[in-house]
Amino acid sequence: IHHYILEQIKTAFATEPNIAATIHGQRRIFQGCYRRRTALFPSKKCGGSIPTESRLELAHAVCLEQNPSVINYRSQALKIKLSHEQYCYPDFLIQTIDGCYEVHEVKPSVASLALDEYVRFDRIATLLHILVLMYHPFLFVPYQPFLFLTYH
Protein backbone atom coordinates (compact mmCIF):
# COMPACT_ATOMS: atom_id res chain seq x y z
CA ILE A 1 0.00 0.00 0.00
CA HIS A 2 2.88 2.39 0.72
CA HIS A 3 4.37 1.87 -2.73
CA TYR A 4 0.93 2.54 -4.22
CA ILE A 5 0.64 5.91 -2.45
CA LEU A 6 4.15 6.96 -3.46
CA GLU A 7 3.34 6.01 -7.05
CA GLN A 8 0.19 8.16 -6.87
CA ILE A 9 2.27 11.13 -5.69
CA LYS A 10 4.66 10.71 -8.60
CA THR A 11 1.78 10.40 -11.06
CA ALA A 12 -0.10 13.37 -9.59
CA PHE A 13 2.74 15.80 -10.16
CA ALA A 14 3.56 14.35 -13.59
CA THR A 15 -0.03 14.83 -14.79
CA GLU A 16 -0.39 17.46 -17.49
CA PRO A 17 -3.48 19.66 -17.82
CA ASN A 18 -6.17 18.45 -20.21
CA ILE A 19 -7.28 20.43 -23.27
CA ALA A 20 -9.38 22.68 -21.00
CA ALA A 21 -6.23 23.40 -18.89
CA THR A 22 -7.71 21.49 -15.92
CA ILE A 23 -5.66 19.14 -13.74
CA HIS A 24 -7.94 16.48 -12.27
CA GLY A 25 -6.98 14.24 -9.37
CA GLN A 26 -7.92 10.65 -8.55
CA ARG A 27 -11.44 11.80 -7.75
CA ARG A 28 -12.88 14.10 -10.37
CA ILE A 29 -14.74 17.17 -9.19
CA PHE A 30 -17.54 18.00 -11.59
CA GLN A 31 -18.51 21.62 -12.05
CA GLY A 32 -22.08 22.89 -11.96
CA CYS A 33 -23.66 20.32 -9.64
CA TYR A 34 -26.83 21.54 -7.94
CA ARG A 35 -26.27 23.14 -4.50
CA ARG A 36 -22.50 22.69 -4.63
CA ARG A 37 -19.99 25.51 -4.77
CA THR A 38 -17.39 23.97 -7.05
CA ALA A 39 -14.79 26.13 -8.76
CA LEU A 40 -11.78 25.98 -11.03
CA PHE A 41 -8.83 27.89 -9.59
CA PRO A 42 -6.29 29.00 -12.22
CA SER A 43 -2.86 28.28 -10.73
CA LYS A 44 0.51 29.47 -12.02
CA LYS A 45 2.30 27.06 -9.69
CA CYS A 46 0.38 24.07 -11.05
CA GLY A 47 0.36 25.19 -14.67
CA GLY A 48 -3.40 24.77 -15.00
CA SER A 49 -6.73 25.03 -13.25
CA ILE A 50 -7.27 23.15 -9.99
CA PRO A 51 -10.84 21.96 -9.28
CA THR A 52 -12.17 22.64 -5.78
CA GLU A 53 -15.35 21.36 -4.10
CA SER A 54 -16.17 24.29 -1.85
CA ARG A 55 -15.44 27.92 -1.16
CA LEU A 56 -13.26 26.86 1.75
CA GLU A 57 -11.14 24.64 -0.52
CA LEU A 58 -10.94 27.52 -3.00
CA ALA A 59 -9.68 29.81 -0.20
CA HIS A 60 -7.11 27.19 0.77
CA ALA A 61 -5.94 26.95 -2.86
CA VAL A 62 -5.43 30.73 -2.84
CA CYS A 63 -3.35 30.39 0.35
CA LEU A 64 -1.26 27.62 -1.22
CA GLU A 65 -0.72 29.73 -4.34
CA GLN A 66 0.57 32.62 -2.22
CA ASN A 67 2.69 30.49 0.14
CA PRO A 68 6.36 30.80 -0.89
CA SER A 69 7.25 27.40 0.62
CA VAL A 70 4.78 25.60 -1.68
CA ILE A 71 6.04 24.87 -5.19
CA ASN A 72 3.20 22.68 -6.46
CA TYR A 73 -0.10 21.18 -5.33
CA ARG A 74 -2.99 19.06 -6.56
CA SER A 75 -6.57 18.56 -5.39
CA GLN A 76 -8.06 15.11 -4.67
CA ALA A 77 -4.80 13.58 -5.91
CA LEU A 78 -4.55 10.58 -3.56
CA LYS A 79 -6.86 7.61 -3.17
CA ILE A 80 -6.09 6.04 0.21
CA LYS A 81 -7.61 2.68 1.09
CA LEU A 82 -8.86 2.66 4.68
CA SER A 83 -10.64 -0.70 4.74
CA HIS A 84 -11.94 -3.35 2.36
CA GLU A 85 -14.41 -1.04 0.61
CA GLN A 86 -13.67 2.36 2.13
CA TYR A 87 -11.42 4.95 0.50
CA CYS A 88 -10.42 8.48 1.37
CA TYR A 89 -9.50 11.31 -1.00
CA PRO A 90 -7.70 14.04 0.98
CA ASP A 91 -8.37 17.54 -0.32
CA PHE A 92 -4.82 18.58 -1.26
CA LEU A 93 -1.42 17.05 -1.99
CA ILE A 94 1.36 19.64 -1.64
CA GLN A 95 5.01 19.65 -2.72
CA THR A 96 7.25 22.02 -0.72
CA ILE A 97 10.49 23.76 -1.67
CA ASP A 98 12.50 21.44 0.59
CA GLY A 99 11.32 18.39 -1.39
CA CYS A 100 8.73 17.21 1.14
CA TYR A 101 5.11 16.32 0.50
CA GLU A 102 2.14 17.29 2.62
CA VAL A 103 -1.46 16.14 2.61
CA HIS A 104 -4.09 18.69 3.66
CA GLU A 105 -7.71 18.12 4.59
CA VAL A 106 -9.89 21.25 4.79
CA LYS A 107 -13.01 21.30 6.98
CA PRO A 108 -15.30 24.19 8.05
CA SER A 109 -15.00 23.81 11.84
CA VAL A 110 -13.99 21.50 14.65
CA ALA A 111 -17.58 21.42 15.89
CA SER A 112 -18.83 20.05 12.58
CA LEU A 113 -16.65 16.94 12.74
CA ALA A 114 -18.24 13.66 13.75
CA LEU A 115 -16.36 11.11 15.85
CA ASP A 116 -15.89 8.81 12.86
CA GLU A 117 -14.17 11.68 11.00
CA TYR A 118 -11.68 12.08 13.87
CA VAL A 119 -11.02 8.34 13.72
CA ARG A 120 -10.58 8.53 9.95
CA PHE A 121 -8.14 11.46 10.28
CA ASP A 122 -6.14 9.49 12.83
CA ARG A 123 -5.96 6.43 10.55
CA ILE A 124 -4.82 8.56 7.62
CA ALA A 125 -2.23 10.35 9.78
CA THR A 126 -0.82 7.02 10.99
CA LEU A 127 -0.57 5.64 7.47
CA LEU A 128 1.05 8.77 6.06
CA HIS A 129 3.41 9.11 9.03
CA ILE A 130 4.89 5.73 8.11
CA LEU A 131 5.61 7.21 4.67
CA VAL A 132 7.12 10.32 6.32
CA LEU A 133 4.39 12.49 4.82
CA MET A 134 2.92 15.37 6.77
CA TYR A 135 -0.86 15.21 7.23
CA HIS A 136 -2.58 18.46 8.15
CA PRO A 137 -6.29 18.72 8.76
CA PHE A 138 -7.02 22.42 8.36
CA LEU A 139 -10.02 23.39 10.42
CA PHE A 140 -11.47 26.82 9.80
CA VAL A 141 -12.16 28.81 12.95
CA PRO A 142 -14.28 31.98 12.54
CA TYR A 143 -12.35 35.23 13.06
CA GLN A 144 -9.02 33.42 12.86
CA PRO A 145 -6.99 32.11 9.96
CA PHE A 146 -6.57 28.34 9.87
CA LEU A 147 -6.14 26.28 13.01
CA PHE A 148 -3.07 24.28 12.10
CA LEU A 149 -3.11 20.75 13.50
CA THR A 150 -0.07 18.59 12.84
CA TYR A 151 0.11 14.85 13.28
CA HIS A 152 3.59 13.37 13.68
Each PLM stretch: what is its role?
Residues 1-152:
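Electrostatic, structured charged patches in enzyme active sites and in nucleic-acid/phosphate-binding
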